[in-house]
Design a protein with these regions (language model features):
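Short, low-complexity Ser/Thr-rich regulatory SLiMs
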Residues: 10-14, 66-68
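One face of beta-strands
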Residues: 6-8, 46-48, 62-64, 119
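A eukaryote-biased signal for long
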Residues: 22-25, 54-196
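Intrinsic-disorder-associated interaction segments
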Residues: 31-32, 41, 66, 81
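Tandem-repeat/low-complexity and Cys-motif detector
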Residues: 10-11, 38-41, 51-56, 98-100
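Beta-strand-dominated lipid-handling architectures at cellular/organellar boundaries
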Residues: 5-7, 16-37, 72-76
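N-terminal intrinsically disordered, low-complexity leader regions
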Residues: 1-12, 181, 188
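Short, hydrophobic/aromatic-rich segments at coil-to-beta transitions
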Residues: 1, 43-51
């Protein structure tokens, strides 16, 4: 039996059927294809534009970022996030300097309704662009995924440890603490339903 931390994603195959993709936790990120400046930016948690090789042997430009949880290198082709950046630039009236800064991994802080709002490229977000109420420091500190300590499903519960890792516990293995948390969660959900 081999146990290893990993992330997984459900994807749809070309034939329309679902499949599971696993991303194991690596000891370190494979950064040898990036120059020293790019490696520094990636290790600082920034999304950068770099050349990537495709499955068919071609090269293209993509936004690249390290997934801190697995140390895997993620990438998204530049046109996908580029379109989202273009829409953002039009809505927020951003100039080329602001857009270029974001393309180089720097979050941008704006004032909206007298409050600071920070936006930047983050490949963890489904649009590739993440917003945060607050300054750039808060944007950098904000967790990429927000989960409760306990996330209950139909037959079990995902439990988050102090390091942000999730472990699945089937109902048969619930402790008294988990049963109590499930009752509290049900009460909160019931109360929220009454106030709608």
């Amino acid at each position: 039996l081999i146990e290893s931390r990993s992330r997984f994603a459900l994807v749809r195959r070309d034939d329309g059927r679902p499949d599971v993709v696993f991303y194991p936790v690596l000891e370190s990120s494979p950064l040898e294809r990036y120059d020293e400046a790019q490696q520094k930016q990636l290790l600082d948690g920034k999304a950068i534009i770099a050349d990537v090789g495709t499955a068919d042997g071609r090269h293209s430009k993509a936004f690249v970022q390290i997934d801190e949880g697995t140390k895997q290198v993620m990438y998204v082709p530049t046109p996908i996030i580029g379109r989202n950046l273009q829409v953002l630039a039009e809505i927020m009236h951003l100039g080329p300097v602001e857009v270029n800064g974001m393309q180089n991994g720097e979050p941008l802080t704006l004032v909206v309704d007298d409050e600071p709002v920070t936006v930047g490229i983050d490949l963890h977000d489904k649009t590739g662009i993440r917003f945060c109420s607050g300054d750039s420091q808060k944007w950098k500190e904000q967790p990429k995924r927000e989960w409760d300590k306990y996330t209950f499903g139909v037959y079990g519960c995902w439990v988050m440890d102090d390091d942000g890792n999730l472990d699945y516990v089937p109902e048969e293995e619930y402790t008294e603490e988990l049963w109590n948390e499930q009752k509290k969660s049900a009460e909160r959900n019931r109360a929220a339903g009454l106030h709608k």
